């Protein structure tokens, strides 16, 4: 198994992100797996699984923005903010598509959002969902988020409305669904959620667990083209090619002075085109941030 790669998975409904990792550990023959961006069990879609040395890339992604397709159900409010929870309020739906489309623009832009009780956000070291399961409510502080785009997609069923949302890391679509309901004057909850983009990864690059498990069992996963190189996640950064002397400095953690490049972060390659890792240039000094390539 490639010990430094990324496997984009189309997470199935009913699975936690941890469930996916647990299943893949056996199939891939390694325990060193990680993921970027937890998905709720009911949600489907993009879950990037980082393998081996690539796990160090998960928290270094330059792009953390997400895109979702979310179905909002009007007339129902639950304790979890989605249809898996216990109903807290029901009401007749007196609004429709026109009213929903009219309120969507007010949710665009930078704003503060209160994290839901059923979330992994920690207060005093304890995840909020643990307190929620005990019936407790913890005081929370709103957090800054950004919603870049909201597009109305249609109504798959009476009372259900689907939107596409492009947003920043840390945005809770369950909270957005409830807030849209509040703006409409009716209770609302999340009926379905599918993540179609997470940073550098798109749903078109993802494969289902049955597909991945079958390829792993057949011994064809390495040749499938489904395993992406770790530099895929850094594609938005400028590239820098270094000679053997600078390469040696990088591997040894030594800075290179008088380096001619603009200040900033770079993905670094050697003369043979092998991806080495990340480095920063500051006032003419090139300093390694992280090496992903194993020294030959």
Residue positions per predicted region:
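Accessory RNA 3′-end/elbow-binding domains used by RNA modification enzymes
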Residues: 1-9, 18-35, 39, 43, ...
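Catalytic cores of RNA-modifying enzymes
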Residues: 1-169, 173-207
